[in-house]
Amino acid sequence: MKIDAIEAVIVDVPTKRPIQMSITTVHQQSYVIVRVYSEGLVGVGEGGSVGGPVWSAECAETIKIIVERYLAPHLLGTDAFNVSGALQTMARAVTGNASAKAAVEMALLDLKARALGVSIAELLGGPLRSAIPIAWTLASGDTKRDLDSAVEMIERRRHNRFKVKLGFRSPQDDLIHMEALSNSLGSKAYLRVDVNQAWDEQVASVYIPELEALGVELIEQPVGRENTQALRRLSDNNRVAIMADESLSTLASAFDLARDRSVDVFSLKLCNMGGVSATQKIAAVAEASGIASYGGTMLDSTIGTSVALQLYSTVPSLPFGCELIGPFVLADTLSHEPLEIRDYELQVPTGVGHGMTLDEDKVRQYARVS
């Protein structure tokens, strides 16, 4: 089977509510939906970045241009089943641009799996689990609203793990916020925080022990992405797990973090790491180094989330579960099939490919008019 055509379209999907981070506030998510065609079959992938280029070096506009102008011409007419060959071709054609490459690889894997009548997880060796515990992000910026949200999620048996966004208030106000959540939720919930690089090492060294005393189990990216030595010292000096997110994007960065034992947990993100194959390799580095893997998100839609679930279902150990909440914070969906949360766990889609069918009407509705 040869690749006949590759298409990329930008869609802008609003969120149900603003998502407040230390670096930006997200009101909508922009995705690039990539379709790869071969002999009447189509595979679908997705690229994107949280809040645009403020989080990473890519945005929807660059992803679309890279896919259409710089990747597609090199892939047309090549073997649609040879995903490894396509990855090498893309690496030679374009430096960086991880999300653009990830979107194409997702589409190729979806196409291949559908042609063979299997899931992407089966292409990757087979799933080890059918569901993954999922954390909900508390990011309204308001303590009462966050607490009400957490209580509702627990009562509905959707979430009992909560990641709280910190860093857009003062550290002292963050601590007061966490004290209120911890005291109110008690043993009914597992709490973790994401600082999104907002602290320096001195501030982190003061407030991480305070958070640990409140029962926080995981601290995500407390300092700047380049300051990996600070991450190492914070990991050495605290019992609570420290997780790399922004500091981790390539196989080389994974090796450096593992060699220096800078963190306890790797946050896996397909679009940030360049796709399924690259993320698999980073998960293998974590496993070999005794570092835990975590199923991260780029606020992906049902398409990207389903591909992530296919991969995460094959990772040997995910002690902290995942946070694939993208489809549940969006005001609408891009697929006909919904994703299901049951008893605090996100169910891995069944069926062929990534398990989702693109809703073409929704794509047309949210497609950006250039």
Curated annotation (Swiss-Prot):
Q: Which SUPFAM superfamilies match?
A: Enolase C-terminal domain-like (SSF51604), Enolase N-terminal domain-like (SSF54826)
Cytoplasm among the record's keywords? no
Give the first-level EC class, as a single word: isomerase
EC number(s): the record gives 5.5.1.7
- Pathway membership: Aromatic compound metabolism; 3-chlorocatechol degradation
User: Which reaction equation describes what this protein catalyses?
Assistant: 2-[(2R)-2-chloro-2,5-dihydro-5-oxofuryl]acetate = 3-chloro-cis,cis-muconate + H(+)
Q: Name one GO molecular function term.
A: manganese ion binding
Q: Which domain of life is it from?
A: Bacteria
Q: Which cofactor does it need?
A: Mn(2+)
UniProt KW keywords = Aromatic hydrocarbons catabolism, Isomerase, Manganese, Metal-binding, Plasmid
UniProt keyword Cytoplasm present: no
Q: PANTHER family annotated for this entry?
A: O-SUCCINYLBENZOATE SYNTHASE (PTHR48073:SF2), O-SUCCINYLBENZOATE SYNTHASE-RELATED (PTHR48073)
Other comments on record:
Chloromuconate cycloisomerase II is highly active toward chlorinated substrates but retains diminished activity toward the non-chlorinated substrates.
Report what the protein is called.
Chloromuconate cycloisomerase
Q: Which organism is it from?
A: Cupriavidus pinatubonensis (strain JMP 134 / LMG 1197) (Cupriavidus necator (strain JMP 134))
